[in-house]
Regions:
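Glycine-rich, low-complexity intrinsically disordered segments
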Residues: 1-101, 105-138
């Protein structure tokens, strides 16, 4: 395995009522609450063009994840067969990146209220990308 390393610097943080992994739903569509994304002032200019009603992809770093897990029961359900972590959306993985498709509900300065999102309070945000609605073939 390559020993090349890359540095990722968070651009912000999630502020959520979800205080622990146990409190978080497995997926955003499973009764996840709204949350705030607090974007660092040094990169806040990058929010220009994002508007209320926009769908965005938040890329987060699951800072509470176990990075040494390669196989698991999907959704921690012991009745399901063990499978490789790359065939699941488990936060426990070698590089615990989270992808969250959310709606922008409110913008206040360098803060975005988004939802629904299953990320816990304090989760680092490493990037924000727009949802592209057009086909990649066009």
């Amino acid at each position: 395995m390559s020993e090349t390393r890359y540095e990722i610097r968070p651009i912000g943080v999630i502020r959520s009522e979800l205080a622990s992994r146990e409190a978080a739903p497995r997926q955003g569509y499973e009764s996840a609450p709204d949350a705030w994304v607090e974007v660092n002032s040094a990169v806040a200019e990058g929010l220009e063009g994002i508007s209320v009603g926009s769908e965005i992809i938040l890329i987060t770093w699951f800072h509470k994840a176990h990075r040494d897990i390669l196989k698991l029961h999907p959704r921690r359900d012991k009745s399901k067969p063990v499978t490789g972590v790359f065939s699941t959306r488990s936060p426990d993985r070698p590089n615990p990146l989270g992808l969250h498709r959310v709606m922008v509900l409110e913008i206040t300065g360098n803060r975005l209220r988004v939802g629904p999102i299953e990320a816990i309070d304090g989760t680092p945000v490493v990037d924000i990308k727009p949802v592209l609605l057009q086909s990649m073939d066009s």
